[in-house]
UniProtKB/Swiss-Prot annotation:
Superkingdom assignment: Bacteria
Molecular function via GO: structural constituent of ribosome
Source species taxonomy: Bacteria, Fusobacteriati, Fusobacteriota, Fusobacteriia, Fusobacteriales
Record's GO cellular component terms: cytoplasm; ribonucleoprotein complex; ribosome
Family: Belongs to the bacterial ribosomal protein bL33 family.
SUPFAM superfamilies in the cross-refs: Zn-binding ribosomal proteins
Protein name according to UniProt: Large ribosomal subunit protein bL33
NCBIfam families: PRK00504.1 (NF001764), PRK00595.1 (NF001860), rpmG_bact (TIGR01023)
HAMAP family to which the protein is assigned, alphabetical: Ribosomal_bL33
Keywords noted in UniProt: Ribonucleoprotein, Ribosomal protein
Organism: Fusobacterium nucleatum subsp. nucleatum (strain ATCC 25586 / DSM 15643 / BCRC 10681 / CIP 101130 / JCM 8532 / KCTC 2640 / LMG 13131 / VPI 4355)
Keyword Ribosomal protein assigned: yes
């Protein structure tokens, strides 16, 4: 079952990325490096609750 998740920046708390994940195969929280347009660099984004 794929669900949509929101990613939040750990530095600026921006939430402007969404993605999907399979909860059955990846039950842990998602973390990935994404580009932050405010800081103009890549930062760590973590999965948040809606």
């Amino acid at each position: 079952m794929r669900v949509q998740v929101i990613l939040e920046c750990t530095e600026t708390k921006l939430r402007h990325y969404t993605t999907t994940k399979n909860k059955k195969t990846h039950p842990e929280r998602l973390e990935m490096m994404k580009y932050n347009p405010v800081l103009k660099k890549h930062t760590l984004y973590k999965e948040t609750k809606k």
